[in-house]
């Protein structure tokens, strides 16, 4: 389907039936949402785009238009229980032949709408993200004290910020280079949101309810809390968001204010943040509550094509270490009333999950093969962690 016929940059067509409400999108590598947002060589749809897709789909379903009238909020201005389950990755040459077709479904739920973003494969759904939309009835929050935030912390300029995120594996084009300046201390960070000079702003802002470029910048502001380490071997990826509230139209956003969510704590590999998008005088435009991130290894940074074409390593010899010890995932079996699970049981379970996720033949996955050989990315690894935890207990990153 041509861009001219699209209902929204993230929705090409309404594919609803009498039984279900759904919309379709065909993603190509040359779209700015993918071309300007990469981790390593991989074009990855930003998590912020999942939220925009849900908001615009709900407007289409309820109002018949993808965007609310100028100056209005969406009918459903709160998004709850957002889960980013898998990344949507598109190969660099996926112009038409290899473009990925995804869909979003909507289902009524307690006065709101549940949504699911997925790729259909026959009767099966590969789910990338989910959540719930509902009305926003909370009063306008108190404004932030911009004067305090602008004078309380270390200052990072655009070039410093761009270098810091490049070190973390991000390859961002102009549409996502929105952090002009960042003021950070140990507990909070304030970022000035501004597109680089020379960028045509209209295509990346005007067609959206919540422009993914700006929301992505707000999410990355949280990673600047405490300053930027000179070296890092992990990526902090968003995995869940408890609530997003829209109080005003997005037009006037100038700052992103992030702070640690100490009420919900953090660990060596997880963290929780609260983030506000603010206008020029500190009024809250958008509020994000309990953004959960997880630190994952720099895996999945190879090109998607290379990962898909990679051959597994040789079968494990008698003395080889299991894949769970290959500096990617370490499983600690839960102690049961009887003897703890054997190493073989853990390895066999992990192999079965890898086969399930990648759809490779059983003979192509070996215990000695690095997870990156099988095209696994960071979010898939998180999924493996969850499955191992459900089977054996606590799973830690190493």
Feature-to-residue mapping (PLM):
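Acyl-thioester-processing domains in fatty-acid/polyketide/NRPS systems
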Residues: 1-324, 328-332, 344, 383
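Low-complexity, intrinsically disordered or signal/transmembrane-proximal segments
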Residues: 335-336
């Amino acid at each position: 389907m041509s861009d001219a016929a699209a209902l929204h940059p993230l929705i090409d067509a309404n594919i609803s039936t009498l039984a279900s409400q759904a919309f379709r999108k065909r993603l190509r590598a040359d779209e700015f949402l993918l071309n300007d947002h990469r981790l390593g060589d991989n074009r990855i749809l930003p998590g912020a785009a999942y939220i925009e897709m849900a908001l615009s789909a709900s407007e289409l379903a309820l109002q018949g238009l993808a965007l609310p009238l100028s100056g209005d909020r969406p009918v459903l201005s709160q998004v709850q229980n957002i889960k980013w389950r898998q990344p949507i990755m598109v190969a660099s040459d996926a112009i038409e032949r290899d473009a990925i077709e995804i869909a979003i479904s909507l289902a009524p739920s307690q006065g709101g709408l549940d949504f699911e973003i997925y790729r259909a494969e026959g009767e099966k759904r590969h789910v990338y993200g989910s959540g719930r939309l509902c009305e926003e009835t909370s009063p306008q929050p108190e404004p932030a004290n911009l004067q305090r935030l602008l004078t309380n912390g270390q200052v990072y300029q655009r070039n410093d910020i761009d270098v810091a995120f490049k070190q973390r594996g991000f390859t961002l084009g102009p549409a996502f280079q929105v952090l002009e300046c960042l003021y950070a201390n140990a507990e909070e960070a304030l970022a000035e949101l501004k597109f680089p000079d020379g960028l045509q702003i209209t295509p990346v802002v005007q067609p959206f309810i919540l422009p993914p470029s700006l929301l992505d910048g707000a999410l990355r502001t949280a990673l600047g809390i405490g300053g930027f380490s000179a070296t890092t071997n992990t990526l902090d990826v968003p995995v869940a968001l408890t609530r997003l509230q829209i109080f005003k139209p997005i037009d006037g956003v100038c700052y992103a204010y992030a702070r640690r969510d100490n009420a919900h704590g953090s660990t060596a590999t997880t963290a929780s943040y609260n983030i506000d998008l603010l206008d020029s005088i500190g009024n809250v435009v958008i509020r994000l509550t309990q953004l959960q991130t997880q630190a994952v290894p720099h895996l999945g940074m190879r090109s998607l094509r290379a990962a898909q074409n990679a051959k597994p390593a040789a079968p494990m010899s008698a003395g080889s270490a299991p894949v769970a010890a290959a500096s990617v995932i370490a499983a600690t079996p839960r102690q049961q009333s009887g003897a703890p699970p054997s190493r073989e049981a853990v390895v066999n379970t992990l192999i079965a999950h890898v086969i399930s996720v990648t759809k490779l033949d059983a003979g192509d996955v070996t215990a000695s093969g690095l997870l990156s050989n099988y095209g696994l990315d960071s979010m898939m690894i998180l999924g493996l962690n969850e499955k191992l935890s459900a089977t054996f207990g606590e799973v830690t990153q190493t």
